[in-house]
């Protein structure tokens, strides 16, 4: 995806966007053709405002013209930002404008709404024709940013689903502090937590690192078949809280506009039903201390009470280690600070 700053500062005499000839001397169609020959999709950027976030021409009042231009250039994906938008036109109408323009441009272009969750995006975004919607501000390549976004997402579990996915933002996995969003980078364990959480939420997975420099460890992580399976599961069920106390396992409280679950020490336990009857289980330690007793959950919290005569058999998606429930409980492995573990559980006879 080519983000902001790709165009000239003025449109041409016909009101069309013009690619900067110094940055793209052969034009955007040439770039698209090159990318398509590599077997990849080509994404571009525009904005619902009067100018983009960096002050370049945006698509407000030019939606149909710009959609036609993107189609002519062979664009497959449009990131549509929200900077400097008209205060006289509500957000849902701004995104409907581009949504209907793309629907009539003659090319199948995935519409990625990037309104950062502002103006109650979650309430109206499915009306606009958008295929995905950004629910937070921009991510940065540091643990503090990843953790903040994870905690904030607990507010939006009900609003994800097929047709209009909650886009938690691009992946910073493997950036290692490089790039304009680099703020020191993360450890491998923090990157694992980041990637695993995105997969539990079925977020679009878009690598933000330079794939020409990707290291073996990062490549192994982002191609983990079980994690990808969880992210791409055909049901796209939303995750839900699980825990060791049924009366508290689904409670949420709001603090500074961020939802926190009731687990002590910042440990979050999530489950997600999969298409084949199995269950993804995620154990996320957002704290600075090691998990202890709070890594246990009742099988009843995923709909399998002990009275059913069934047990859960969990398999760690990285190590392959198996854990069998006992007495209606599952005790998972302890995970260290900022670490996580993900399992796929199947229901078996007791």
Residue ranges and their predicted role:
Residues 198-201, 206-208, 259-304:
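Carbohydrate-binding surface patches
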Residues 193-260:
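Catalytic cores of secreted or luminal carbohydrate-active enzymes
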Residues 62-65, 93, 103-210:
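Glycan-recognition surfaces
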Residues 1-87:
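Aromatic-lined carbohydrate-binding/catalytic grooves of carbohydrate-active enzymes
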Residues 2-5, 45-50, 80-85, 111-118, ...:
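Active-site-proximal beta-strand/loop segments in catalytic clefts of secreted hydrolases
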Residues 299-320:
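Solvent-exposed beta-hairpin/edge-strand motifs
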Residues 35, 70, 111, 200, ...:
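Conserved, mostly hydrophobic/aromatic
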């Amino acid at each position: 995806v080519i983000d902001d700053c790709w165009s000239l500062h003025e449109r041409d005499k016909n009101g069309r966007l013009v690619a900067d000839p110094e940055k793209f001397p052969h034009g955007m169609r040439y770039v698209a053709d090159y990318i398509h020959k590599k077997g990849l999709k080509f994404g571009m950027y525009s904005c619902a405002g009067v100018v983009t976030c960096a002050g370049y021409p945006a698509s407000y009042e030019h939606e149909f013209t710009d959609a036609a231009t993107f189609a002519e250039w062979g664009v497959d994906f449009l990131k549509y930002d929200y900077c400097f938008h008209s205060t006289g036109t509500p957000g849902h109408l701004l995104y409907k404008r581009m949504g209907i323009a793309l629907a009539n441009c003659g090319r199948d272009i995935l519409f990625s709404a990037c309104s950062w969750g502002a103006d109650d995006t979650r309430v109206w975004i499915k009306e606009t024709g958008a295929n995905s919607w950004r629910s937070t501000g921009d991510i940065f390549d540091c643990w503090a940013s990843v953790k903040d976004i994870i905690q904030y997402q607990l507010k939006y579990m009900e609003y994800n689903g097929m047709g209009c996915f909650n886009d938690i933002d691009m992946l910073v996995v493997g950036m290692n502090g490089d790039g304009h969003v680099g703020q020191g980078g993360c450890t491998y364990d923090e990157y694992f937590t980041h990637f695993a959480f995105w997969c539990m939420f079925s977020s679009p997975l878009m690598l933000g690192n330079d794939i020409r420099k990707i290291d073996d460890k990062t490549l192994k992580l982002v191609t983990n078949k079980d994690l990808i399976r969880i992210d791409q599961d055909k049901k796209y069920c939303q995750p839900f809280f699980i825990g060791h106390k049924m009366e508290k396992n689904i409670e949420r409280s709001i603090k500074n506009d961020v939802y926190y679950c009731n687990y002590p020490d910042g440990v979050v336990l999530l489950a997600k039903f999969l298409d084949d009857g199995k269950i993804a289980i995620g154990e996320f330690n957002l704290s600075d201390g090691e998990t202890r007793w709070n890594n246990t959950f009742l099988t009843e919290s995923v709909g399998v009470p002990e009275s059913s005569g069934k047990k859960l058999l969990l398999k760690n998606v990285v190590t392959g280690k198996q854990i069998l429930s006992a007495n209606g409980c599952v005790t998972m492995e302890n995970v260290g600070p900022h670490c996580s573990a993900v399992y796929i559980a199947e229901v078996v006879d007791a």
